[in-house]
Amino acid sequence: MDSSHVTESQGTLLFNEPLAEYTTWRVGGPAARLYKPANIDDLALFLSRLPFDEPLLWLGLGSNSLIRDGGFSGTVILTQGCLKEMTLLSDNCIRVEAGVSCASMARFSARNNLSEGEFWAGIPGTMGGALRMNAGCHGGETWQSVIEVQTINRRGEIRTRKPEEFEVAYRHVAGLGDEWFISAKLQLTPGNKETSLQLIKDLLAHRAKTQPTNEYNCGSVFRNPPGDFAARLIESCGLKGVSIGGAVVSEKHANFIINHQGTATAANIEALIHLVQTKVREQTSIELIREVHIIGDANVQTR
């Protein structure tokens, strides 16, 4: 890729950049290129100058993603720390950019006396990722609050879209096509600051008690099948504590795979994911569907 046009951009372009530090599993090989946009306009300019066939990967906080050990041979767009504006609007609405962490969004809405966004505190990702997969927990889902979204395509063209243009389901949003979410307008419910902040505190305490928050993990690995829970199925198959290399099925919550003390490779984690799926299928006839996106090249290459 000819990167001479980047001199006109305001963001930061890095080459052969290790991706492990940008993911919550702390694994993954390097990206051929990684771009940190200065703002949405800068992102649009950068994309407009990219070759149309350039492979693109969008990363927020790097949860819900397994980057393989061979890395990614295209360009990674990093939104965390970049697209981070939150604006309080009228009618109990907030405009939030894709790089804002879900936890920050939860606190911002609570401090502005808005409720029904407290659940975001329990999601270890960005709002862009939450929009992409309709992330949720504790009875809340992201798209229950969406009024409109802004998307951008690989030409750098931005447009505003309404929820009815998408098919939104449990941990799935269809209809995005070759576009990415860059911001959203969300409508919440009038609430009480102290009540919401206490709810967030309680939620985080429950999360720390029931999930391996002190270990490298990506969040839930599998979707819950209809009428059941992935964690229950995995535990019922005797898979808690099962390991491949440094990848371990958490003893605390069976739907989490941890990178124990940072010793796992992406290949270890991917192999353990497949092992869990196989054992659950063999013992229960239920196919666990991944929430995690597996990305990149399996083989480590010399660049």
Curated annotation (Swiss-Prot):
Pathway linked to the protein: Cell wall biogenesis; peptidoglycan biosynthesis
Residues annotated as transmembrane: none
Name of the protein in question: UDP-N-acetylenolpyruvoylglucosamine reductase
Catalysed reactions listed for this entry: UDP-N-acetyl-alpha-D-muramate + NADP(+) = UDP-N-acetyl-3-O-(1-carboxyvinyl)-alpha-D-glucosamine + NADPH + H(+)
Domain of life per record: Bacteria
Role played: Cell wall formation.
Lineage: Bacteria, Pseudomonadati, Pseudomonadota, Gammaproteobacteria, Legionellales
EC number from the UniProt entry: 1.3.1.98
Provenance organism: Legionella pneumophila (strain Paris)
